[in-house]
Curated annotation (Swiss-Prot):
Belongs to the small GTPase superfamily. Rab family. Gene3D superfamilies: P-loop containing nucleotide triphosphate hydrolases. Residues 72-88 are annotated as: Switch-II. This is Ras-related protein Rab-40B. Residues 267-278 have a biased composition (Polar residues). Residues 175-228 form the SOCS box domain. The lineage of its organism: Eukaryota, Metazoa, Chordata, Craniata, Vertebrata. RAB40B small GTPase acts as substrate-recognition components of the ECS(RAB40B) E3 ubiquitin ligase complex which mediates the ubiquitination of target proteins. The Rab40 subfamily belongs to the Rab family that are key regulators of intracellular membrane trafficking, from the formation of transport vesicles to their fusion with membranes. Rabs cycle between an inactive GDP-bound form and an active GTP-bound form that is able to recruit to membranes different sets of downstream effectors directly responsible for vesicle formation, movement, tethering and fusion.
Length: 278
């Protein structure tokens, strides 16, 4: 509770996502793999609708997700139309071991474009743990997602693989669309090798990397890392660049200035033989 007696919110943003797809693609399995959050809607919902909430961390901010799943059966199309209102993101789900579910994504996209046009979407291939029964090649699904202009994931609720990552990416897309680009920059967990490279190049100019007592392959990686991340930008181009620019400017200025010297008259008592230039 805050000082004024009002409850403190446990999240910074609240988003509503819809999981759409055929009835047997495992959308309920995805929701069941989420341990935290309520499994019942506070507003109540009819049969054929599954609901769950979960909270994710996105660049240090707490984002609460309301996840709604229609059964995917034809008789619930009316329910889908009503629950699609106000949705801020859509998760298109198919079963990688069921070709029919993948071919049905086009039908769901038409429904979404009709009742929730412009809502950000991602494509999710579910049940990756059944890869030995795969009927939808990863390359084909990836090409299909690129044609739609959406992000693609393959997930496994059984292994808890890519579930949170897919939700997090969709939340990032939604918040970026709503003008949160200043706060929601893509985050990256650096590997131990990247951390070591960052520590080295932060105190070593790139032109001195070749002189480090390291294997050639490692020196080459350090140089590439330095140029890619711009950590040596100041040492590479800072003082030397400004000095070169300044001196070049001065030389060009001198060339433009015409020196005018006052006329000099020879001394009165100076002759050709007696006058010497010191």
């Amino acid at each position: 509770m805050s000082a004024l007696g009002s409850p403190v919110r446990a999240y910074d943003f609240l988003l509503k996502f819809l999981l759409v797809g055929d009835s047997d693609v495992g959308k309920g399995e995805i929701l069941a793999s989420l341990q935290d959050g309520a499994a019942e809607s506070p507003y109540g919902h009819p049969a054929g609708i599954d609901y769950k909430t979960t909270t994710i961390l996105l660049d240090g901010r707490r984002v609460k997700l309301q996840l709604w799943d229609t059964s995917g059966q034809g008789r619930f199309c009316t329910i889908f139309r009503s629950y699609s209102r106000g949705a801020q993101g859509v998760i298109l789900v198919y079963d990688i071991a069921n070709r029919w579910s993948f071919d049905g994504i086009d039908r769901w996209i038409k429904e979404i474009d009709e009742h929730a046009p412009g809502v950000p979407k991602i494509l999710v291939g579910n049940r990756l743990h059944l890869a030995f029964k795969r009927q939808v090649p990863t390359e084909q699904a990836q090409a299909y997602a690129e044609r739609l202009g959406v992000t693609f994931f393959e997930v496994s609720p059984l292994c808890n693989f890519n579930i949170t990552e897919s939700f997090t990416e969709l939340a990032r897309i939604v918040l970026l669309r709503h003008g949160m680009d200043r706060l929601w920059r893509p985050s990256k967990v650096l590997s131990l090798q990247d951390l070591c490279c960052r520590a080295v190049v932060s105190c070593t100019p790139v032109h001195l990397v070749d002189k480090l007592p390291l294997p050639i392959a490692l020196r080459s990686h350090l140089k590439s890392f330095s140029m890619a991340n711009g950590l040596n930008a100041r040492m590479m181009h800072g003082g030397s660049y400004s000095l070169t620019t300044s001196s070049t400017h001065k030389r060009s200025s001198l060339r433009k200035v015409k020196l005018v010297r006052p006329p000099q008259s020879p001394p009165k008592n100076c002759t050709r033989n007696s006058c010497k230039i010191s």
